[in-house]
Amino acid sequence: YVTNQFTAMGGLKPGLVRLLTMTGVLTTVNWAARHITSRGHLGRIRTIHFARWVFLDGKQRMVFFSNYDGTVESYMDDFINKTGFGLNAVFSNGIGYPRTNWLVLDGCQDEQKYKDFLRRHTLPTQVWYKAYLGLTAIDLERNTRIRQGLESTSLSEQEAREWAALL
């Protein structure tokens, strides 16, 4: 398949500071996803269709769901290489995550420990939904830009050239 699903679940480190940190980080990520990176990207990663974190058991555990294009190996590499600081900010609050410094440094930079951590917490996915079969996140972004160009009542010459290049 072009698109795959990833689910991981694990316990949160105990303590009020960790809970407040995790809640604050996820609130920030949610705000940024809606207001800064809302053009189909998560940071510099352009292959993610969907991502969601959900607290469980009175906020003692957490589950992460994601739909992405490519292999699980390329998915993990994208996070390490493109948004490592954000990955560390979220997952460093999880029990067993590779040690970080100042919340966002190190952690996933130890690639093997990070990948081992994810593999230990990965759950098999029984069912999931994809609205646009056969289309990657990049295809969907391009199609959105084509539609916006068709709906536009005025394009500059440069914008018209950029739009035509999408076809």
What are these regions (language model features)?
Residues 54:
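Aromatic/basic-lined ligand-recognition segments
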